Amino acid sequence: MAGHSKWANTKYRKERADHKRGKIFSRTIKELMAAVKMGGPDPKTNARLRVVIQKAKDQNIPNENIERNLKKATSADQKNFEDVTYELYGFGGVGIIVEAMTDNKNRTASDMRIAVNKRGGSLVEPGSVLYNFARKGACYISKSSIDEATLLSHVIDVGAEDLDNDDEENFIVLCDPVELASVKEKLVALGVTCSEEKLIYVPLRLVDCDEKDGEANLALIEWLEQIDDVDEVYHNMA
């Protein structure tokens, strides 16, 4: 979400994009291991695992990495991964949502407390920040693969809700979460390649803050994004 902020300069956006690629790979590997824990290591009988393996291949994760983690997931010592969400208030009334996938919730909670101790802000009760955001389905499409006008016409055709142009590298087609699979399928049928699809949080309103608070919020967000278990950080800073 940093691309939406006037405080996020080009250098920050590039560094974040590079870091995010690594996070995507890490998240997919964790999803793969969770799928094995839930339904076994055979993709022929585990539909969820079959989908995640295809996702990993689409992201160009090497086959040897996939195979190695499939074996690791069957180990009795390997704990299962869980999705967890944290809500924070940063500086100047800015709300922050953190999504993580972890095999140790105590470790992740400790990392979150360290983040606010080092960079400020406050962890708050569930629901305290979420009401400022809407859950949306999102299909990511490389800006190098299609022009905006063409994609916009497709967005209307497939019944999506909006086209977000604020990301540095991708157009983001937004839709109702329950329609995500259908929207992606229709886009693919029209020849559009979706590099990633997932559920995201979109701010319902943006919060203006001064330069001091803006820089403090970015420092907090950067720290949160560096936590190993964290996959996504959303905020509503203008």
UniProtKB/Swiss-Prot annotation:
Record family assignment: Belongs to the TACO1 family.
Protein's name according to its UniProt entry: Probable transcriptional regulatory protein CCA_00169
InterPro entries, per database record: Integrase-like_N, TACO1_YebC-like_2nd/3rd_dom, TACO1_YebC_N, Transcrip_reg_TACO1-like, Transcrip_reg_TACO1-like_dom3, YebC-like
One MF annotation (Gene Ontology) recorded for this entry: DNA binding
Keyword terms of this UniProt record: Cytoplasm, DNA-binding, Transcription, Transcription regulation
Main location: cytoplasm
Pfam families xref list: TACO1_YebC_N (PF20772), Transcrip_reg (PF01709)
Organism: Chlamydia caviae (strain ATCC VR-813 / DSM 19441 / 03DC25 / GPIC)
GO biological process, one term: regulation of DNA-templated transcription
Subcellular location: Cytoplasm
